[in-house]
C-alpha cells in the first residue's frame, strides 16, 4: 500500500534548486549510497569510472535532499522513479515522483559537480564547470538560437558566453515544452555555471552539514 502524500513544507509555488561538489554531497551526514533503490544500484555498479560513478551517486543523493526539503519527507522517503516513454520501460528516462504527480524533478552532473531541482510543474537543471568551453560552433549553431550564437561571438569572452547559453538550453530541454522561466548563475566558490528552467519562480539553497544545536548555558549569577 502506498503511503499518502504528505503536505509540502514550502508554499508549493516555488521551485528549489541546489548545486554542490560531489565531495560535499558524499560527505553530507544524511546522504549515503544505502538510500538508492535496487535499480539505481544496478546502474551504478555498471559504471566503470570511479569519478563518474561518484558523480552519478552524488546527483541522485542531492535530488533526494531537494525533494525532502520541498515535500517534508526525509531523504530516505524521497526516491524518484524514472520512465522512458519511447521504449515504455522504467529505470531510465525523465525522473518523476510517484506521490506527487504535479511536481517536477531534475538532476545533473559534470566532472565533480552536481545539481538538482524540484518544483511545481516542469523543471530542468544543468550544471557545467565554469572552465568548460562547448563546441564546435557548427554543432552549437544547430542547438542554440542564432541570436544567442551572435551575441556570444560579440562578448568579451565568447567561450564563457556560449557556456551560459548552453546550460540554459540544456535546462530547458530537460524541463520540456511550456512557458519556462530560466534562472542562471555562476557559483564562483565551486567554479560552476548553473541554470534552472521551471514553470514557477526558483530559489536555491546551500548544501552543507546541518548546523549543530545551540546550547544555552545557565548564566553565572556571580558575574
Question: Where do the model's predicted regions map?
Answer:
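Core catalytic alpha/beta fold that binds nucleotide/phospho-ligands
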Residues: 1-223
Amino acid at each position: 500500500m502506498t503511503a499518502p502524500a504528505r503536505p509540502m513544507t514550502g508554499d508549493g509555488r516555488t521551485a528549489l534548486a541546489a548545486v554542490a561538489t560531489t565531495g560535499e554531497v558524499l560527505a553530507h551526514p544524511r546522504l549515503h549510497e544505502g538510500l538508492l533503490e535496487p535499480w539505481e544500484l544496478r546502474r551504478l555498479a555498471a559504471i566503470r569510472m570511479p569519478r563518474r560513478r561518484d558523480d552519478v551517486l552524488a546527483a541522485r543523493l542531492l535530488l533526494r535532499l531537494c525533494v525532502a526539503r520541498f515535500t517534508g519527507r526525509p531523504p530516505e522517503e524521497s526516491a524518484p522513479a524514472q520512465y522512458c516513454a519511447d521504449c515504455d520501460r522504467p529505470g531510465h528516462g525523465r525522473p518523476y515522483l510517484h506521490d506527487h504527480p504535479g511536481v517536477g524533478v531534475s538532476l545533473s552532473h559534470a566532472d565533480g559537480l552536481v545539481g538538482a531541482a524540484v518544483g511545481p510543474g516542469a523543471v530542468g537543471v544543468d550544471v557545467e564547470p565554469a572552465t568548460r568551453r562547448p563546441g564546435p560552433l557548427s554543432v552549437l549553431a544547430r542547438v542554440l538560437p542564432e541570436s544567442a550564437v551572435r551575441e556570444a561571438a560579440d562578448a568579451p569572452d565568447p567561450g564563457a558566453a556560449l557556456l551560459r547559453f548552453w546550460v540554459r538550453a540544456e535546462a530547458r530541454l530537460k524541463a520540456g515544452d511550456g512557458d519556462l522561466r530560466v534562472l542562471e548563475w555562476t557559483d564562483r566558490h565551486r567554479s560552476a555555471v548553473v541554470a534552472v528552467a521551471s514553470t514557477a519562480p526558483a530559489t536555491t539553497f546551500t548544501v552543507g552539514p546541518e548546523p549543530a544545536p545551540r546550547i544555552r548555558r545557565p548564566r553565572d549569577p556571580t558575574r
